[in-house]
Amino acid sequence: MDTNKTIMVVDDNPDIITIVKTILEGKGYTVLSASSGPELLNMLKGQKPDLIILDIMMPEMDGLEVLSRLKAVADTSTLPVILLTAKVQYEDVLGGYKLGADYYITKPFTSTQLVNGINLLLGEGKS
């Protein structure tokens, strides 16, 4: 699948960024990355991705705070956000959705889970 969509991956673990980037670039996406919430928010001043994949457990500013800030600003409130996290408790998932997450994937994850979530949100059909 060739696409001109851009996806931003935000995770403090460079290995996760590399894995996600490899999967998505293989599907034709342009992938940008940030290693923290503040870095993402700064990058969004100059460019808007089509979708954000966001870790929850990060230093400085956790992903839920980042999500809240994204959803509170008109410019970014409609950006689809997938939470990709090791937080697996029902309360964590529910909390993510209540703050405006569009999809929730727990680690460890498969490429199929990731691509299907993106396809669902970007209307790209099946992988």
Predicted regions: what they are:
Residues 18-26:
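Charged docking surfaces used in two-component/phosphorelay signaling
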Residues 28-35, 43:
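Short hydrophobic/Thr-rich beta-strand motif most characteristic of the beta2 strand and flanking loop
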Residues 47-53:
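Active-site beta3 strand of CheY-like receiver
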Residues 58:
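Receiver (REC) domain active-site loop signature in two-component systems and cognate sites
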Residues 109-119:
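C-terminal output helix
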